[in-house]
Every structure is written in C-alpha cells, then in structure tokens.
C-alpha cells in the first residue's frame, strides 16, 4: 500500500473487526507491561526498612499504585508496612502481577482471533450489507459499563463493603495503612486531601454515568446534531476519546505534583511544596515545643520525634531537586539512608541559638548563613576569609545534637561545625550509604516527579492530537474539496476537480 508511517492507521478506518483487534492488542501490551514491570520491581525491591528506605526512595513506580488500592502483602512473606505475613492470599503483589500477565495473554489471543475473523455479521449494516458501526449506541454502552465500574469501585472497593478499602494516612504520612473509607457527602468531600471524597465522587460519577449511558442507549441523537458533530465518523470517536484522556492526564499530573488523598506521601514521597513551606519542620518544632511544655529536656523532646517525620524534612526527598533527565532512583543519588544523626543546634559564644538558613528548592549551591531568633545574621561560612566578619572561627560557633544517633554529642572544632552547618542547609541530617549502590551524590527525583512530567507531557501532546483529529473530522469536506451540499449527480472523471463544472475535461 505504501503508506507513510504516520498514516498506517487508515487500514482500520473502515474495518470495524480489525479496529477492535488493534484495540485489544493495545490492552494486551498495556496489561503485559504493568505485570512485567511489577515483577521486575518486586525482584529488586528491598522491603527491610519501610521508614528510611521506602518504595519511593527505591524508585518503585507500579508498587505504590497497587498499594494505594489495598495490596500490602507479598508471597515472599513480607508486608509493605514492615514485619512478616504467613498467609498473603491470592491478591498479593505477585498475584496482581500474574493476573495482569494472564489477562495480557488472553487479550493477545483475542486480538489475533479478531484480526483473522474480521468480517463478522455484527459489524454489518442490515440494510446495505456493508461494514458499519452504530457509534451513538456504542457510546451509550461504554458509558453505561464505565459507570457501573466507577460506581462499583466507589461503593464496594473503597468503602470496604466488598474489598479492602484504600491507603489512608495522617497529614504527615506517619500512620498510613489500608482501611475502608466512608463516603464524604458534605462540603468536606471536595477537599482533595479527604479520602472520603474518593468514595463519594466515584459513587456520584458512576451513578451519573449509568444514567447517561441508559439515556444514550434509549434516545437517538437529532439529525442536525448527528451531522453537526459528525457522529457517524469514527475519527470523531478518536478525537473525543483523546480529549477525555488528555483531560484526565492533566488532572492526575496536578493531583500528583501538588498532592492529594490519592497520592499519599508514604507511597510516592513528599511534594516539593512541603519543603518550600517548611511543612514537616513546623510539625517537628510543634512536637518539640509540646514536649518542653511537659517539662521534658531538649534531648528527651527531640528523641521522641519519629525518624520517619525527620526523614521527610530532608531536601534529598524533594522531588523537584532531581533533574528530569537524571536516571535512577533517589537511592542512586544521595545514597541509602541509614540513620538520623539527630537535630543540630548551633550557638555562638554568647549562648545565642543560631538557625542555619535552608537551601531553597531550585538552588544547587547556597551560602551557609546562621541567623538568630530575630533573623539577624550572626555567623556564616565566608567566600573570602580576608573580608569575613561572621566566620565560625570569629563568632565561636558550637553545635550540639539532640535526638538521633549523636544525641548529647557537641562539637566546637570549626571544621566540624562548618561541616554540619552545610548539611543542616539540607534539612535534618542523616547518615547515607553511598557505597552499596555506588551512588553519585547528585539528587534524583522521586516517582512523583516522573509521573507528573510524563503525564503533563503526554497531556500536552494529546491536546494537540485532539485539535488535529477534531479539525480533520469537522472540516473533512473542506479538506476533500467536495461541497457537502452538492446534490447533483456527478460523473466521476468528467471534471478535473470532482463536482466543479468549471474544470470540465477536454475530449482528447
């Protein structure tokens, strides 16, 4: 046929049987990738430390999606929350992966069958005997079935009525677990961080989809609307489907990057805005202040800070710190976190407590500046020592650790103080193992960053695809050069341009 690569899909334009076949094959490829990727991730995933080496630090991409839907156990005997399990059941991580691969194989066989047996009676118009699809009816069927699935997910799976529920956590990502969720029917259901909104919105959207599907199955579109929206053209279906997909991709890119109940930080890592706003730092200071108010010592108050909370307050877990084209997991960047060294408190020789100014997200280097409680600069690590007034040596800065592995340890040696001041720019200080994975010390993004970049990019691409195919559908007659209102009988070959009497061919 000699079609260029970008026109090869025209072979299924007027062939409903093979159009169905290629879509089934596409589903086979998607399901096959999902199952294979899950098995690969399970082969390389280390579940031994869910606090300091969680799935998102290891670069897991499909495991978080399985987990948020209620899968927590492995046939390997481990649980995602730590500990061991003796009876994980069929719906373990491996079970879900296997189900996708089996489903992929069945779809592969079905695609081949439909490619071979393409000329089925169901695709033929009874009146003309030619291949034809009743697209408005098919739209109604799909809308009804997707509505049933949507309603079922919200009413049964999420609520735990028939299913495990979903992953639910506290605002600081400390107590996450899979649990049933009650629908939130009040205004709180519109809060993107309220899990109940997931149940209620699926129930509401599913109900609407079922009703809309039944409507489109029982009511035929008016002739003027049918012609105006080109409802008889398969490219209209392509255009509107692309619109639905790019809209969904933009939405999920937003919920992933800005955070929501559907993208828990325990599964996908924290958002960049939590670093920008000092979200975890504020909660840590609130807990320490509460401890001091209960007459605890500084050491006791800091020792009660969960290591998990301290780890979130570290810039290496900020998804915006990794370049988009730096391949590999976060562990391949700054290393595998081994332990929290504790919270460093700096003081000058007059006893004032000093705070290291933290590095903003989009800086690779940042001056080391220590300020007092009023924000006045008291010490720094100068670029030019000859002109320095506030150097650590001149000001006599010391550092003492509270909580963590170095609890109670203090340093007055300027070189050591400066080392920890530099590290305090990056948030809480952790011991990182860079030897095991030969980590290069350059920050990487988390799966939250990859997902957002991928979906935003494809959404933009699909937006242009929607415009392209929509225009081709609506203006097909213009592009073809045929007047749609032409009702005269035209003899093919009589004119150089079809239907244009001014281009009548001259007799040879």
Swiss-Prot record:
Coiled coil: none annotated. One of its GO terms (cellular component) is chloroplast thylakoid membrane. Keywords: Chlorophyll, Chloroplast, Chromophore, Membrane, Photosynthesis, Photosystem II, Plastid, Thylakoid, Transmembrane, Transmembrane helix. It is found in: Plastid, Chloroplast thylakoid membrane. One of the components of the core complex of photosystem II (PSII). It binds chlorophyll and helps catalyze the primary light-induced photochemical processes of PSII. PSII is a light-driven water:plastoquinone oxidoreductase, using light energy to abstract electrons from H(2)O, generating O(2) and a proton gradient subsequently used for ATP formation. PSII is composed of 1 copy each of membrane proteins PsbA, PsbB, PsbC, PsbD, PsbE, PsbF, PsbH, PsbI, PsbJ, PsbK, PsbL, PsbM, PsbT, PsbX, PsbY, PsbZ, Psb30/Ycf12, at least 3 peripheral proteins of the oxygen-evolving complex and a large number of cofactors. It forms dimeric complexes. Belongs to the PsbB/PsbC family. PsbB subfamily. NCBIfam families: PS_II_CP47 (TIGR03039). This is Photosystem II CP47 reaction center protein. The lineage of its organism: Eukaryota, Viridiplantae, Streptophyta, Embryophyta, Tracheophyta.
């Amino acid at each position: 046929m000699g079609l260029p690569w970008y026109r090869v899909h025209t072979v299924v334009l007027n062939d409903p049987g093979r159009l169905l076949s290629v879509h089934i094959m596409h589903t086979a490829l998607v399901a096959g990738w999902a199952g294979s990727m899950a098995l690969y991730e399970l082969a390389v995933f280390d579940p031994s430390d869910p606090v300091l080496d969680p799935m998102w630090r290891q670069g897991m991409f499909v495991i978080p999606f399985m987990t948020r839907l209620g899968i927590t156990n492995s046939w390997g005997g481990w649980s995602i929350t730590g500990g061991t399990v003796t009876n994980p059941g069929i719906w373990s991580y491996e079970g879900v992966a296997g189900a996708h691969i089996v489903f992929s194989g069945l779809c592969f066989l079905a695609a081949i069958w439909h490619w071979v047996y393409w000329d089925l009676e169901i695709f033929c118009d009874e009146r003309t005997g030619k291949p034809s699809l009743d697209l408005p009816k098919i739209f109604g069927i799909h809308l009804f079935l997707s509505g049933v699935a949507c309603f079922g997910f919200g009413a049964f799976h999420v609520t735990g009525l028939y299913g495990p529920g979903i992953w639910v956590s506290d605002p600081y990502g400390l107590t996450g677990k899979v649990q049933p969720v009650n629908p939130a029917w009040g205004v709180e259901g519109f809060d993107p961080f309220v899990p109940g909104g997931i149940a209620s919105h699926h129930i509401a959207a599913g109900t609407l989809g079922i009703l809309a599907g039944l409507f489109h199955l029982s009511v035929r579109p008016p002739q003027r609307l049918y012609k105006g929206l080109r409802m008889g053209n398969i490219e209209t279906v392509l255009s509107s489907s692309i619109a639905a997909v790019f809209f969904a991709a933009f939405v999920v890119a937003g919920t992933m990057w800005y955070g929501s109940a559907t993208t828990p930080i325990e599964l996908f890592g924290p958002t960049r805005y939590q670093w920008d706003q000092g979200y975890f730092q504020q909660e840590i200071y609130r807990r320490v202040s509460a401890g001091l108010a209960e007459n605890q010592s500084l050491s006791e108050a800091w020792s009660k800070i969960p290591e998990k909370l301290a780890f979130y307050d570290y810039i290496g877990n900020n998804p915006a710190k990794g370049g988009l084209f730096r391949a590999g997991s976060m562990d391949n960047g700054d290393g595998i976190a081994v332990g929290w060294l504790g919270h460093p408190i700096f003081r000058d020789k007059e006893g004032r407590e000093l705070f290291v100014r933290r590095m903003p997200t989009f800086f690779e280097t940042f001056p080391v500046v220590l300020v007092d409680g009023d924000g006045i600069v008291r010490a720094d690590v100068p670029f030019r020592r000859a002109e320095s007034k506030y150097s650590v040596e001149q000001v006599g800065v010391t550092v003492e650790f509270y909580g963590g592995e170095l609890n109670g340890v203090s340093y007055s040696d300027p070189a050591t103080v400066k080392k920890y001041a530099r590290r305090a720019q990056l948030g809480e200080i952790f011991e990182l193992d860079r030897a095991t994975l030969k980590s290069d010390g350059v920050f990487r993004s988390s799966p939250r960053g990859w997902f957002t970049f991928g979906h935003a990019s494809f959404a933009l691409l699909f937006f242009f695809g929607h415009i392209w195919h929509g225009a081709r559908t609506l203006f097909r007659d213009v592009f073809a050069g045929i007047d749609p209102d032409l009702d005269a009988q035209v003899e093919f070959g009589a004119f150089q341009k079809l239907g244009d009497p001014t281009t009548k061919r001259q007799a040879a």
